[in-house]
Amino acid sequence: LRESKESWLDIITPPLRLLCNEIIKDVVSQHQYKADYVCAIDSLTMKLEGCIREICRRRSIPTVTEDKHNEILLEKLLDKLGEECNLDGSLLLTPCTHKLLMTVLTKQGYNLRNNIAHGFTNLSDYNLQNAIMVLHSLLKISAIKV
């Protein structure tokens, strides 16, 4: 977050509450309830990327790089950031957490972040499996000490 009194928790709580409510209704109804995960998954996936970038910045891991002409600053791709998180030997991400995040967010797996950001999703992508993957990823990220 840019300088403000808000925390990530303030921003994550509303879509997290929405996601948990939908999961509970879906599971309790034994999948008879037509859960609507669209807003929660979209929002939390983008917040997940923001949290990862914030953790990197707080650990002095650069989140931007220059283009090949050294003219423009570009945000590093998440897979590149994931590689750099453990370069200093601090093991910021455990191998399990790293694998989970790369599977959920990058081309190495579901590429959920890119697909959402660029509108490449279908309604069928907003399902219980993806909801739980995003929730699990958030829980893993929240355990990182900065």
Give the residues covered by each predicted segment:
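Helix-start/N-cap signature of alpha-helical segments
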Residues: 4, 8, 40, 105-106, ...
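Short acidic alpha-helical/loop segments enriched in Asp/Glu that coordinate divalent cations
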Residues: 26-44, 53-72
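Charged alpha-helical initiation segments
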Residues: 1-38
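Short, mixed-charge amphipathic alpha-helical segments
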Residues: 1-4, 36, 79-115
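Generic, well-ordered alpha-helical scaffold segments in large soluble proteins
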Residues: 15-18, 22, 50-54, 58, ...
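Charge-enriched, short contiguous segments at helix-coil
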Residues: 98-146
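Extended hydrophobic/aromatic segments used for targeting, binding, or gating
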Residues: 63-87
